[in-house]
Amino acid sequence: MLENRVKTKQIFIGGVAIGGDAPISTQSMTFSKTADIESTKNQIDRLKLAGADLVRVAVSNEKDALALKELKKVSPLPLIADIHFHYKFALIAAQSVDAIRINPGNIGSKEKIKAVVDACKEKNIPIRIGVNAGSLEKQFDQKYGPTPKGMVESALYNAKLLEDLDFTNFKISLKASDVIRTIEAYRMLRPLVIYPFHLGVTEAGNLFSSSIKSAMALGGLLMEGIGDTMRVSITGELENEIKVARAILRHSGRLKEGINWISCPTCGRIEANLVDMAIKVEKRLSHIKTPLDISVMGCVVNALGEAKHADMAIAFGNRSGLIIKEGKVIHKLAEKDLFETFVIEVENLAKEREKSLKD
């Protein structure tokens, strides 16, 4: 059952609202050296085109920190500086970026955290308290180990530090590399704080592994009403992080946008190369943002049965096929004419739906 979203304190990263009633935002992280402004800008452009709302960049040295001023000028997305170990880089970054991410397990003493808070206060930019199971502060790691309890205690401790400094412009993340700890940690912390949550499974693996872990962990939390912004961490292409994240949002009922693809797993009745055709159709129609159920089937049995509730369906037969709109056959065509006709019909349906929404 889809639960109502937990209403959290709203913060802003650039012009993007996080928490409250704001849409759940997606983000990724560049892998270039941040000081290489041209390469980093190119990656941010790719993420923008893929549909990302925010971008995070690594600040590994002073050169990276100083480059943020120029990068901010050319970035099409709000910029988050990711800081580990060296709090002074955060002080430099705060002068240019839209938000700072710190890992309390390695940023240093209370005095160093205060310095970062003061810099963020001055520029009115938020902080993400980024707790990772693998790098908890010594006192929590020794007492609890890399457990949900240890992660939650770290988050509460650091939230209190910021609150005591009269700073509440922050969000929290609790990341582990597996599904169970991730879910348990967020569930445990949610009733204890009002701050927005950034969701993610850290070091989740390649496209296949990460997609499964993230769908289970983040999708489950989203359906429980937990989560305000998210990243799907994938060892691979940047665009895949956004593609998978937006798919998780759609299928967890938190994003009413884009096509819900329905296709059969194939069987002995199949009379066409359905795998290639399904890939071809999805790629050709990937630009459509209108919510539609689109079905690609390998035979008329499934098309007239399982796919009859789709907004539009295509079914392949013996060198011919059907195009079905809202349960009614509208075309019976030779196989060579099916694809282009189907694409046109889906695009026209999307335009009809968009027009009706505006009217």
UniProtKB/Swiss-Prot annotation:
Top-level taxonomic group: Bacteria
Cofactor(s) needed for function: [4Fe-4S] cluster
Alphabetical keyword list: 4Fe-4S, Iron, Iron-sulfur, Isoprene biosynthesis, Metal-binding, Oxidoreductase
**Any one biological process term the GO annotation gives:** isopentenyl diphosphate biosynthetic process, methylerythritol 4-phosphate pathway
Listed SUPFAM superfamilies = Enolase C-terminal domain-like, Nitrite and sulphite reductase 4Fe-4S domain-like
Which pathway or pathways does this protein act in?
Isoprenoid biosynthesis; isopentenyl diphosphate biosynthesis via DXP pathway; isopentenyl diphosphate from 1-deoxy-D-xylulose 5-phosphate: step 5/6
Q: Name one GO molecular function term.
A: 4-hydroxy-3-methylbut-2-en-1-yl diphosphate synthase activity (ferredoxin)
Key word Nuclease present in the record?
Answer: no
**Nucleotide-binding as UniProt keyword:** no
Q: Pfam families recorded for this chain?
A: GcpE (PF04551)
Which Cys pairs does UniProt list as disulfide-bonded? none
Q: Which family does it belong to?
A: Belongs to the IspG family.
What function does this protein fulfil? Converts 2C-methyl-D-erythritol 2,4-cyclodiphosphate (ME-2,4cPP) into 1-hydroxy-2-methyl-2-(E)-butenyl 4-diphosphate.
What is this protein identified as? 4-hydroxy-3-methylbut-2-en-1-yl diphosphate synthase (flavodoxin)
Q: Which organism is it from?
A: Helicobacter pylori (strain ATCC 700392 / 26695)
Q: What is the lineage of its organism?
A: Bacteria, Pseudomonadati, Campylobacterota, Epsilonproteobacteria, Campylobacterales
User: Gene that codes for this?
Assistant: ispG
